[in-house]
Amino acid sequence: MGFAAILSASRASADSSGGLRACLHFAGQTLVEYQARQAVRAGADRIFIMVSVITPALSQAVDRLSADGIAVALVRDMVSMVRDAPRDVDALLMADGAIVSQAHVDSLGAAEGDTLLVADDSRASAPLERIDAGQRWAGLARISPALLFGTLDMIGDWDLALTLVRSAVQKGARRVTVPEADLLEGRAALVESQQQADLVAQAVASAGTTRAHARGGIEHYLFVPLARSAGSMLMRLQVPALQVRIGAMALAAIALVPIELAWVLTGFCLLLLALLLAESADRLDELALRRPPQGWTAFVPPGLALVGIVLAGGTTTAVDLALLSGVLMVADRWRRSGAAAPWMMLTPASVLILLLVAGALGLMGEGYRVAMLAAIASAAAVILRPRA
C-alpha cells in the first residue's frame, strides 16, 4: 500500500537573498522537488508541501512535479491538512531542507508504524534537531495516521514537523540510526544555504543512483562511465538536462554535413560525441531522480546516427543495417532485450566505432558487412536467448 509524504517549505535559507531553503537549487531542480521525487521513488502516491507563503518558485516547482504525473498540493494551514491528508495510510515526513540518501528514504518507505531516522549526538550531527540527550532527528520519519491526526487536532501556531517528531518520541517510536559516515559524507544533511546544497549535491553525484538506467553495447562499457563523470560536472555547473539533450540533437544534425562532404570519419566522431552528450543528459535525469525520456526526444541523436550510417554507406546493406540497428536500439532503450547481456547488444554507437575502425584501415565496405552480421547475431540473442 502506498503512503503520503509531507514536506515543509517555510524556513528561510542562510543566503543573503532571503529565499526559502526549499527553493535552493539542487540536482537540476529545487530542493523540495528533489525531496518529492525521493518520496515518490520510495512509494509515496501523493505529496503535501506545508508552506507559510506561496512563492512563484514554489508554484513553478509544483507545476513541474504535476507535469511528471506526481500528485502534489500546497497546504497553508492545519485545516487544509486535516481535510486533505489520507486517514488510512501512513505519512512520510521530511524536514525543511533535509537531504537523505535514497536508501534511507526507501527503508522508511518500507517500514511499518511510527519510525524515526536519527543520528547519535556528535559534532557531525550538531545542525540536526535534538530529540533527547543522546540523539538527534535526521530529518526523516514515518508517521501513522493515529499520530498524525492526533497531533493535527491540537490547536496553535507551531512547527508541524517538529511537533510530530516530538510526539513520536514520546510514544516510543522505533528508531533507525544513521551511520556517522553518512553525516560526514553528505548522505544525510540539513541544507541551509546554496553552498551547502552544492556540496551535498556533489556527494549525491559521487554516490550515484541505485537504479541507473541499463544500457547495452559500447554505451554500457564506455559511454555510461564517461557520462557519469560528465553528469557530475554538468550538475555542479547547474546545466539542465534538457539543454544537454538539445545540444546532442544539434550536434548529431551537424555531423551529417561532413558525412555528405565525404569526410565520413569526422562525421562519425561527431556522432559519437552527440551520443555521449545524450547519455550525459540521461545521467543528469537520473541524478535528479527523473525517469529518462522514452519518447521521440530519446531517439533523435541515435536516429540521426543511423541516418549518418546510411549516408556514409550509400548501399542497400547500409539501409538494412540501419533498420535492424534501429530495432535493437528501441529494444535496448525500452528494456525489451530479454536476457541478452550488454555485450550482445549492437547499438548505434557500437556500429559507429566498428565502422570507424574499418574506415581507418581502408575497409569500409567490409566493415558494413561485419556490422550487418553482428546486428543479425544481436537480434538472434534478443529473440532466442532463454529468459530467466
Where does each model-flagged region fall?
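Conserved core of the sugar-phosphate nucleotidyltransferase
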Residues: 86-88, 98-172, 287-308, 318-320, ...
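Short catalytic helix/loop segments, enriched in acidic residues and glycine
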Residues: 22-35
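Short, acidic, metal-binding catalytic loop of nucleotide-sugar glycosyltransferases
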Residues: 38-44
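Generic detector of multi-pass transmembrane helix bundles and their immediately adjacent loops
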Residues: 300-388
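Conserved alpha/beta core of the MobA/IspD/sugar-nucleotide pyrophosphorylase nucleotidyltransferase superfamily
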Residues: 136-249
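Core alpha-helical transmembrane segments of integral membrane proteins
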Residues: 216-298
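Short phosphate-binding loop-to-helix
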Residues: 52-106
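N-terminal nucleotide-binding beta1-loop-alpha1 segment
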Residues: 1-19, 23, 375-382
